[in-house]
From Swiss-Prot:
RNA-binding in keyword set: no
Keyword Phosphoprotein attached: no
Active site: D24, K133, C166
Function: Hydrolyzes ureidoacrylate to form aminoacrylate and carbamate. The carbamate hydrolyzes spontaneously, thereby releasing one of the nitrogen atoms of the pyrimidine ring as ammonia and one of its carbon atoms as CO2.
Example GO BP: uracil catabolic process
Inducing or repressing factors: Up-regulated by the nitrogen regulatory protein C (NtrC also called GlnG) and repressed by RutR.
Lineage: Bacteria, Pseudomonadati, Pseudomonadota, Gammaproteobacteria, Enterobacterales
Protein name: Ureidoacrylate amidohydrolase RutB
Gene: rutB
Swiss-Prot/TrEMBL catalytic activity: (Z)-3-ureidoacrylate + H2O + H(+) = (Z)-3-aminoacrylate + NH4(+) + CO2; (Z)-3-ureidoacrylate + H2O = (Z)-3-aminoacrylate + carbamate + H(+); (Z)-2-methylureidoacrylate + H2O + H(+) = (Z)-2-methylaminoacrylate + NH4(+) + CO2
Amino acid sequence: MTTLTARPEAITFDPQQSALIVVDMQNAYATPGGYLDLAGFDVSTTRPVIANIQTAVTAARAAGMLIIWFQNGWDEQYVEAGGPGSPNFHKSNALKTMRNQPQLQGKLLAKGSWDYQLVDELMPQPGDIVLPKPRYSGFFNTPLDSILRSRGIRHLVFTGIATNVCVESTLRDGFFLEYFGVVLEDATHQAGPEFAQKAALFNIETFFGWVSDVETFCDALSSTSFARIA
């Protein structure tokens, strides 16, 4: 078992019955010229987050954790995005950006597009699981819950973008399904001003889960590995 120092208190988990979840590390969310950038959100500080996710993934994989990668988006015709009868049609900033800039139609978050692809620095490896998702939460219309339960996984460690949207939405839904959720704060990035990051982390550590960081996470996994060898 691994004990991870976190806020508001430490949490203990078995790495081999836990998953590291990488949320939406796509060009859309982390690269200049991607959806968030074109929609007016600042993505200039995402590079350190990418590096920290690389570090966390390497440590988690070595410890035997399942790695799950999410990609947010829809089919090329945007049927999966929902029409006017869906609140997603009205609230998705990607869909609104394309309606306001018709030349972008079919380019934002469309499966197969550059925007939809994971950033070059973060590539899934054999044994990892890659899941598409059509909404903010990774539990909505995906097999995530079934995948986790069939493997006896109850603890989820979250990284990715955006902390205050898809990361928090997935962690919250997991909380209601009896999963223990931890966010590595320096391996996440918000959509919007910095206060959005702080508010999301406050909500998570106060009501829905735990907050730690990449160095602490890696040290905890390393200590567990040494203990097993000894």
